[in-house]
Amino acid sequence: MNGSRDSAVCTLTRGQAAVGAALVMASVLLLRFELMTFAIILAAAVTLGYAVLGSFKTVLTVNALRRGPVRVPRHELEGLGGWRPTYTVLVPLYREAEVVRNLVASLRQLDYPPDRLQILLLCEADDTATLEALWSARLTPPFEVVLVDPSYPRTKPKVCNLGLERASGRYLVVYDAEDRPEPDQLKKAVAAFRKLPRSVICLQARLEYRNPQTNLLTRLFAAEYGTFYDMLLPSLARHRLPVPLGGTSNHFRTAALRDLGGWDPYNVTEDLDLGMWIGRRGWRVEVLDSVTWEEANSRVGNWLRQRSRWLKGYIQTYLVHMRSPLRLRRELGTRNFLAFQMLVGATPVAALINPLLWGLTAAYVVTGSSFIAHLFPSSVFYVGIVSMVIGNFVFIYYLVTGCMLLSHHRNAKWMLLAPLYWLLMSIAAWKAVIQLMARPHYWEKTSHGLVAEEERAIEATPGDWRPHVLDGELPRNGLAGGHQAAASAAARDRKRAVSGGFQ
């Protein structure tokens, strides 16, 4: 990673810790001597914040209907002729033995010349089960299995950085193990990069779930994805605002990605962080009208692990970029600086305080407490009522619109249960805060392959495979491995127990 960039290796700088301590002390003093005044100011600030956040997202969503993702018509694909620049595909793997077969089958369906393609499967050297599955797949070029040193931090961005060092393609894309990209996605990305300005260094493909009907959780999750990738991100790109990347199907100009320094290995939402750095450099992200199919989390525990990691990463990213607010405003511009506050700062804060506000509302309805009533003078009360009623309606309407955009019409009625989903978000947010203090760089693994494939997997073609080793040993810089003992043991004895991963 580029040493000139701030990193999440340190959660709080001394300056941030000092400011935080001063704010806490000031709050304690106000609570001690001016309890009601402080409470009213706090209630007014929260109410106003909700109103601003709701208005911001409403404007973005309405504008999204005017301009969708970047489309690549058939004639533009045909206009490429035989020109196919080299392309690198990075796939970080850890404990993915169950999905390796389908992953390989999906990547083999990519409509791109094999001699112009480099597919790097990045696997930690002590992940015996996944290595055995890769061995069974009997891979041939353009597949390469790169053994990664299982060293700290054991995160996806660290592994991606090692892949970036090895990448030989003019363009580069990152996929997750459960991804099923459309076969022509690489060609569409090439055509889009060809017609877009050089300042566009990243294309985010649309993500959709292939199992939206599994249960209530997947229905709500799929609708959320519909609003995010089909509405919010295209609108952000249209207004040239910072775009929070998804963790997969990010297509890059490789040279620009290297110039940025790759990913922050200590940030558990490295995609969000990278999207902000792209904006700070004056570069742009666009959304590509090509779909990558993913597996929606169908189990609450698995969903909470994933969402708490995302929210922890949002807080990490906010703290990293706000270490120098004046520099951030100068590099982003005032408009984009304010958008950053709404997109990155307000997201975890809203999830954290939602249950507190719901609790206050319920307590007032049940008890009629005069103390709670005094917290909300008439001006604050009416703004709060409008924000609560209209805001909740609008967010449910967003989810219904997401269902319509994805043709999940049967799921629309279930969006009325969205408050249950928001409650789960709040639980995940508080879990994220606790984990940020205790284990800031811990990567909670999301289990894949929990839902049966909707279509049968394509049989992998047999061939020869061996781990990529240079001069009979793994280089000590960690590019294709690191600690030789761990790597050689994984290659020789694939029955050893797995003891590591993206943590």
Place the predicted regions along the sequence by residue.
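Membrane-embedded multi-pass helical conduit in multi-pass membrane proteins
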Residues: 27-57, 63-71, 75-79, 342-438
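N-terminal signal-anchor transmembrane helix
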Residues: 55-115
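Cell-envelope/extracellular polymer assembly enzymes that use nucleotide-activated donors
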Residues: 85-88, 118, 258, 273
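Acidic donor-binding segment of Leloir-type glycosyltransferases
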Residues: 108-152
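Long helical/loop segments within the catalytic core of UDP-sugar-dependent glycosyltransferases
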Residues: 135-141, 145-165, 169-170, 183-268, ...
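Acidic donor-binding loop at a coil-to-helix junction in glycosyltransferase catalytic cores
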Residues: 268-274
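Catalytic donor-sugar/metal-binding loop of nucleotide-sugar-dependent glycosyltransferases
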Residues: 275-293
